[in-house]
Amino acid sequence: VSNFSAQKTGSYQLQVTQPDTLLSHLTRLTQNRLSQQTLKQLLKNGSVWLQTPNRKPERVRRAKKILSSGQKLFLYYRPELLRLTPPTPTCLADYGDYSVWHKPKGMASQGSKWGDAHALYRWVETHDASQRPALIVHRLDKHTDGIMLLAHGKKVAAQLSQLFESRQTEKRYLAWVEGCFEPQKKLCEEPIEGKAARSWLQRLMQEIEVQGERTLLEIQIETGRKHQIRRHCTALGHPIIGDRLYGQSEKWQGMDMQLSNYFLSFPCPISQQIRTFNLTTQPQWLELMELAWGKNWVIKNS
């Protein structure tokens, strides 16, 4: 075991040589430098993993679980995650086998080895009264808000995943971008990491602010490459306002990324009915947009 620091980010591991509880082994791993309450919080946050010989590491949370000789314990420790409180998502509909959520900006779609307490699926598992498992079937960037589906069983998860993979879903995005975008609907086919990528971009409105010109786009994608919309907007010379990775200009500094997955339509895997969700019909979402941009930006429902 390397020296543990309660103030620094680090990854640590411990070879289990004798049976004892997970909490006791975690105490050894952290060299008694964290309280029992903090250790339990790390378990709850999903920062602790256990590897059994000839198997992949798995996330473990139960403090009283007995570990066996030969197993290996891993801790992925980021002290700042202990202090973070995730934003609150909104349930748009619950069909029992799956539910529909509005994921806010700043909430991850999925966890990482460092933890999953701030991911949408884990928030739902720990806050929803039904205590059902929540499985992700598609993703949104952490800094993009929008509509997400969560499955509550493996069968429905596979069915919903197939809908996205076979492009039986319709997704539409809204993005405020820098500059004056041309009025004609535009197709961007700039390859991403050597793979084909297609995005349609349509100007809805544009305004002149103190910081400069900005345009509201509606975007639909035919492929799902990583950061596709953000990369294509930047490739066209109109980076998304607030995008710190692909071309944030100084005049728009301090703003959240102005990208929302506002529309989702898909065939229900249970009833076969077409389910359609549109955030522009949600008062809470409209209030957030009006707070950021004023009341004149809202588009017509389609």
Regions found by a protein language model. Give the residues of each.
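Pseudouridine synthases involved in rRNA/tRNA modification
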Residues: 1-43, 203, 209-214, 232-302
